[in-house]
Amino acid sequence: MNQQTTNRDTGEAAATNAPANSATSTSTPDNQPTPLDAFEVLLITGMSGAGRSHAADCVEDMGWYVVDNLPPKLLIPLVDMMTTSGSGSESGVHKLAAVIDVRSSYFDELAAVLGHLDDLGVKTRILFLDASNEVLIKRYESVRRPHPLQHGNRLIDGILEERHLLEDLKERADWVIDTSSLSIHQLSTKLYEAMLGSGPTTVAVHIFSFGFKYGMPIDADFVADVRFLPNPFWVPNLRELTGHDKPVADYVLSSKGAKEFLDAYEKAIEIALEGYAQEDKHYVTIAVGCTGGQHRSVAMSEELARRLRAHGLNVTVSAREQHKRHSS
């Protein structure tokens, strides 16, 4: 998935005439303001090449007003303008999404700006797009463009510098999405699930199966290892099937320890989800791994999803290694 460049208002011009030191909504009979506690700000950030621009497109489709490469110091004047002018109320837009990267001016002021927005009662969330160094290198090489922090050095040097600069922001993020193995369509789906699939007291759950032989996932909140179960790969009539097929699912789920593991894991997940909802975390990723990601992990992922859906949870399932076959 190559990051596409989009052209939007940069926000500087929009904020030029906004009061710089006030974000207090005022009202006139013909021009009603948007209350600050009804206004939302989303920061879209992350590694260059990880899909920020596509994420911005998706967020725009969800009804957010999107501004590209906005210097953090202009966030408050822009929010002030959109709330005090009444333009937000007239247009029905109460949500501002700003794409911010390390090239934005005064990036180090972002923490103070976020604190100010919190003090004003503006709901502010952070979406962080990430990808492995290897994938970022391949994406940059495919488009033959330099990294914004490369400065004539090696591509990996620019990537590592950016990763270091974004460490604190990643820690503060409400959503961290790793796009290393995602297509544009899969990223869109994941964004919609994360941002629209949950309410203020519910948590959207995404479960995916994977193979340990292809690497550990880096974006999972929970990782379950089901390699303790008998491997259908070594059963001749099951080898060419996957955990989506009933014979494999029956074999895996009837194995010694499968039910006991699912019972315990289901209970642990329920407890964690209740806590996450209280902490305003609305999206949880569960990875279930076996050796090759074809049999045991797929069957167990589907069964875990079925159980969680029975509790009324919004659960989606995918198989990371679905295009890889003949693997245990």
Curated annotation (Swiss-Prot):
InterPro entries referenced in this protein's UniProt entry, alphabetically: P-loop_NTPase, RapZ-like, RapZ-like_N, RapZ_C
Cytoplasm is among the record's keywords: no
Alphabetically ordered keywords of this record: ATP-binding, GTP-binding, Nucleotide-binding
Domain of life: Bacteria
GO MF term set: ATP binding; GTP binding
Keyword Chloroplast: no
Compositionally biased residues, Low complexity: 13-29
Gene3D superfamilies, A to Z: P-loop containing nucleotide triphosphate hydrolases
Region called Disordered, residue ranges: 1-35
Binding site for GTP: D101, V102, R103, S104
Pfam families: PapZ_C, RapZ-like_N
Residues that, per the record, bind ATP: G46, M47, S48, G49, A50, G51, R52, S53
Function: Displays ATPase and GTPase activities.
Family: Belongs to the RapZ-like family.
HAMAP family from the UniProt entry: RapZ_like
Protein name as it appears in the record: Nucleotide-binding protein BLD_0430
Organism for this UniProt entry: Bifidobacterium longum (strain DJO10A)
